Amino acid sequence: MTIGLVLGCAPMTLAQIDPYTRSLLQLGYDQSLSSQGPQSLYAYYYYNNPGLLRTNVALRLAVAPVYFDGEIGFRQLLSPHTDVGIGINGGGYGENYYEVRQGHYFKGESFDGHGGGVSLNLYHLINPAQLIPLNAVVQGGAHYSVYSATDKTDDQFNLPDDHVRTFARAGLRFGGKEPMLYPDLALEVSVWFERQWRLEDGSYGFAADRRAQPTTDLYWLYAGLNYAWTNTGNQFTFALTAGGSENADRLNAWRLGGVLPLAAEFPLTLPGYYYKEISAQRFVHLSAAYVAPLSADHRWQLRLGAASAYVDYLPGFERPGRWHTGAGPDLSFTSRSQVWRVILRYGYGFNALRDGRDGAHSVGLLYQYNFERRKHRHEKAKRTFNAD
């Protein structure tokens, strides 16, 4: 089980300095009911202050019990439409590796990962006169990773060497999505390329039977839409992600599976599957959901969602069939004040392989608490009381 999983898996980068004040608590848990697989969990506090110290300085923090990710942003530093951010992240258990092949979780070949890094981020707004922003994003940095055995790691299994990884990423992002649990409105189309360099590559495993590659290229396209009819309580979401890689290895290949929506910058969910069950070189991932109200005030909602992916497996992780599909319902309840929200969910993986047969079940829990919304409600109530 990993606390701070969401922070260790991917930096929570945005296409621009976040202009809104935010104070959120996010919790998520996903548990397989079919065999024993990796348990996925995140628990973190998200804070964003767009006006720290001076009007052009912003602070973003995501803090978990044993991991943190942050950025100090400087709006309009290089030009009226170019922002600069300095990112830092680090802590424990954010880079754990889980070996899953043919639907079986190999604990003896899995291990814990820890580390930290820094980055320099540039965000340039290309179309300042338009309502929906188009941003060019350029990022670069370094990350140090260390690995340790769990109490289940095989004594004969040699861990990867501790190493420094540098990276450079460039992308174009049209629109964007708030760092919230299922936001009502969101529109994003983005394309990305990232190159990674390991300063110390090498072999590991049983008698050096696997290797960490010195360089890896990752590229992907994302298109997503969230739209809610607030007068009826209905909502529709859709997302398409297509990605590929060159010279990827176990430690940086594309991983698909699980249902936690905030467990990665670009989550590749598959209901009913283990977290990161599928290892792929290339993939196309589709997801969609429809939300219907169960009460007149729309506080109770039923969400029906599904996800499907076509994958080109990482060598050594092949399995029958290239399509993977999962689906399931969620039951959502929002407090009368709209300060907190809890979601219970169930997922069934149609093509998840368990004991030689297809089909797997999972359950999950999601929770969000919005401190900023509570603050605004208290201030509004205080003003109303004083006016009376």
Regions found by a protein language model. Give the residues of each.
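Bacterial N-terminal signal peptides
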Residues: 1-10
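Outer-membrane beta-barrel initiation region
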Residues: 13-97, 166-184, 280, 294-298, ...
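Transmembrane beta-strand segments of outer-membrane beta-barrel domains in Gram-negative
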Residues: 21-25, 32, 36, 86-237, ...
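Residue-level signature of outer-membrane beta-barrel architecture
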Residues: 47-49, 72-76, 120-126, 172-176, ...
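Extracytoplasmic gating/loop element in the C-terminal half of outer-membrane beta-barrel translocons
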Residues: 232-314
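Short glycine-rich, acidic/polar surface loops and turns
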Residues: 287-289, 317, 326-333
